């Protein structure tokens, strides 16, 4: 059986089976070489503009999360840190109470436009009501987040 050659990593894999290829393609080094390759191609064609990257993640933010996690010694999610920082900025040091999250007024439903639920496939049961409610909550959260940033 012939060996598989990866153009990005410039190496041969020991076997040419789907499981070996799949594990290689999901590997950290392959992904890094893949990203580096297309970044270099973008720079060659002058379409690479680091200032137009849509992500707002900086090294300061990443280091702050790792420092906070080390100092806390807890395994709380990084998004919880954002919530605490945002609440301390707006509420002068108050901690976010997650039980209050569901008590929002539904008056803002008039301002929002919701897509209708997708049609169900014939022969399959309808999805539960929680699917629609969760989608509505996600859309509200996204709208709130975009309105507070602008």
Curated annotation (Swiss-Prot):
Keyword Phosphoprotein: no
GO cellular component, one term: U1 snRNP
Residue ranges crossing the lipid bilayer per the database entry: none
Gene Ontology BP annotations: mRNA 5'-splice site recognition; spliceosomal snRNP assembly
Chain intervals for the UniProt region annotation (Disordered): 66-127
Family: Belongs to the U1 small nuclear ribonucleoprotein C family.
This protein's name: U1 small nuclear ribonucleoprotein C
